[in-house]
């Protein structure tokens, strides 16, 4: 059986799955042909078990349909083709969220050939393989006293003898306790906690990606703060990628590149934000490539963030993209309504402000793009409340966020939703308003109605009237139907998510 057949079937499966599922579970798989048998390699036990349970049956069907029609011989193994260095499922306890949703991982370091034992497809025993670790993290096995609080951000200088001095800022308020968890960030939070609590057995590198203001930086700081809580002597360095570039340029100017290398390669944990700024900076990428390799070979933790999936960063060398996939890559999605409400309630509680639940719900319904804008809106409301000497009510919120709400209403109108949905499904707006019931029109119409209910303040009768004079029960049925399909139909779920993102950003 050929590898080409496998690739053909994987492409067919790509069309059936949401992009995030495909990138998380199928993309990391490697394959090689051994006679009539296909050997499929998963990077670790979790990916293997998940693929076995969720996708193996469909893959075998596709292989049979597109091959000889006979069920193929296929083995699932842990490792990588051509015997890459051994990788392991961690010894430490793994949260259910991580176990259920491990992201784009590939085999770790290249090393002398090591045999990869086949794993029975239905097996579930833990697989333990050697991993290297850094002795300085051994001290984290027992909790230590937390470092003294220093306001919002702690100025913490980490110095290596004979090397550059670099001051790293960890925001002491960005902790796991202050992070509001929801469906959109559950996996990212679980993975970050695993790294923070078990630095010798976590995922390296941990790569978090997603839009602006979704909590990636918060989680990165939370990991750093937790590492320092467990071991105040740990050398934890947080910086923006532009700081790395600036340090390198300065080192070159001072003829101190060796000191620069010594500093960055001696830390216990390196946390770099917005890695996409390395794009098209060839010398910076070259230096970071070697720094990254040195850190992982020493068992030192690396955490990176970006505004997009690493493979999609243009101007970034392929070898870096490949290495970023060695560990765990996790998407952070925009928060859903319930999470937005929880964030507002928590922020109000931290500010010792009474925020009625209906007021939080009102703000959360209208500010949808990211957490940063949500917090900014709440700060405006609180300030307005203090200045006016009034309690926070929906009326006060309307006054304090008047310009912002007007902009949101302008951006997200039923007309705009209809136009966006029609363009997405390549139909006419008149089709959405017509009486046609063919699936190619009826389903987009239901999607548009559901989006109108979620994104606007119109009542069901008003929405129905704007969709060709339909009854409010038709709109209610459409909303319920789309909510059901989002749970069972991958295509509808992906369509809805794409349209929601387009309409709210």
Swiss-Prot record:
Cell location: Cytoplasm
Coiled coil ranges: none
Residues covered by region (Domain II): 91-168
Top-level taxon of origin: Bacteria
Chain positions recorded as ATP binding sites: 213, 215-217
Cystines in this chain: none
Keywords, comma-separated and alphabetical: ATP-binding, Cytoplasm, DNA replication, DNA-binding, Lipid-binding, Nucleotide-binding
Spans traversing the lipid bilayer: none
GO cellular component assignments: cytoplasm; plasma membrane
PROSITE patterns named among the record's database cross-references: DNAA (PS01008)
InterPro entries xref list: AAA+_ATPase, Chromosome_initiator_DnaA, Chromosome_initiator_DnaA-like, Chromosome_initiator_DnaA_CS, DnaA_C, DnaA_dom, DnaA_N_dom, DnaA_N_sf
SUPFAM superfamilies: P-loop containing nucleoside triphosphate hydrolases, TrpR-like
Keyword Nuclease: no
Gene Ontology terms describing biological process: DNA replication initiation; regulation of DNA replication
UniProt cross-references to CDD domains, sorted A to Z: AAA, Bac_DnaA_C
Primary role: Plays an essential role in the initiation and regulation of chromosomal replication. ATP-DnaA binds to the origin of replication (oriC) to initiate formation of the DNA replication initiation complex once per cell cycle. Binds the DnaA box (a 9 base pair repeat at the origin) and separates the double-stranded (ds)DNA. Forms a right-handed helical filament on oriC DNA; dsDNA binds to the exterior of the filament while single-stranded (ss)DNA is stabiized in the filament's interior.
HAMAP family per record: DnaA_bact (MF_00377)
Subunit structure: Oligomerizes as a right-handed, spiral filament on DNA at oriC.
The protein's name in its UniProt record: Chromosomal replication initiator protein DnaA
Species this chain originates from: Pseudomonas putida (strain ATCC 700007 / DSM 6899 / JCM 31910 / BCRC 17059 / LMG 24140 / F1)
């Amino acid at each position: 059986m050929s590898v080409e057949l496998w690739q053909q079937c994987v492409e067919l499966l790509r069309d059936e799955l949401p992009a995030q599922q495909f990138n998380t579970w199928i993309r990391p798989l490697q394959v090689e042909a051994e006679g009539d048998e296909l050997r499929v390699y998963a990077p670790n036990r979790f990916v293997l078990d998940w693929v076995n349970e969720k996708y193996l049956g469909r893959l075998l069907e596709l292989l049979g349909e597109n091959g000889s029609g006979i069920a193929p011989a296929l083995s699932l193994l842990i490792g990588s083709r051509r015997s890459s260095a051994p990788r392991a499922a961690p010894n430490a306890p793994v949260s259910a969220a991580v176990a259920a949703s491990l992201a784009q991982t590939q085999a770790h370091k290249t090393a002398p050939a090591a045999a990869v034992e086949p794993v029975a497809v239905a097996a579930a025993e833990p697989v333990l393989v050697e991993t290297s670790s850094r002795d300085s993290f051994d001290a984290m096995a027992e909790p230590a006293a937390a470092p003294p609080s220093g306001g919002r951000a702690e100025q913490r200088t980490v110095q290596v003898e004979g090397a550059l001095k670099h001051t790293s800022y960890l925001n002491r308020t960005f902790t796991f306790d202050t992070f509001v968890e929801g469906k959109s960030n559950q996996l990212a939070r679980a993975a970050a906690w695993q790294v923070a609590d078990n630095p010798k057995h976590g995922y390296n590198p941990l790569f978090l990606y997603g839009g602006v203001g979704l909590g990636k930086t918060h989680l990165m700081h939370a990991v750093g703060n937790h590492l320092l809580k467990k071991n105040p002597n740990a050398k934890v360095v947080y910086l923006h990628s532009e700081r790395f570039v600036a340090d390198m340029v300065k080192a070159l100017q001072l003829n101190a590149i060796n000191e620069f290398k010594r500093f960055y390669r001696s830390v216990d944990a390196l946390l770099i934000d917005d890695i996409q700024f390395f794009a098209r900076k060839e010398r910076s990428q070259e230096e970071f490539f070697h720094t990254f390799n040195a850190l992982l070979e020493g068992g030192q933790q690396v955490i990176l963030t970006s505004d997009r999936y690493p493979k999609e960063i243009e101007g970034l060398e392929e070898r870096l993209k490949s290495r970023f996939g060695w560990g765990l890559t996790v998407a952070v999605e925009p928060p859903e309504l319930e999470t937005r409400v929880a964030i507002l309630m928590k922020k109000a509680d931290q500010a010792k402000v009474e925020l009625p639940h209906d007021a939080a719900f009102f703000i959360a319904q209208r500010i949808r793009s990211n957490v940063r804008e949500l917090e900014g809106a709440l700060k405006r409301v609180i300030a307005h409340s203090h200045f006016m000497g009034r309690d926070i009510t929906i009326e006060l919120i309307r006054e304090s966020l008047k310009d912002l709400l007007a902009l949101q209403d302008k951006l997200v109108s039923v007309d705009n939703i209809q136009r966006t949905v029609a363009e997405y499904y390549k139909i006419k707006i008149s089709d959405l308003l017509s009486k046609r019931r063919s699936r190619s029109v009826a389903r987009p119409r239901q999607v548009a109605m559901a989006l109108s209910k979620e994104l606007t303040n119109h009542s069901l009768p008003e929405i129905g009237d704007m969709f060709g004079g339909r009854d409010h029960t038709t709109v209610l049925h459409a909303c319920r139907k789309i909510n059901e399909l989002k749970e069972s139909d991958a295509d509808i779920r992906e369509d809805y998510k794409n349209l929601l993102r387009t309409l709210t950003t």
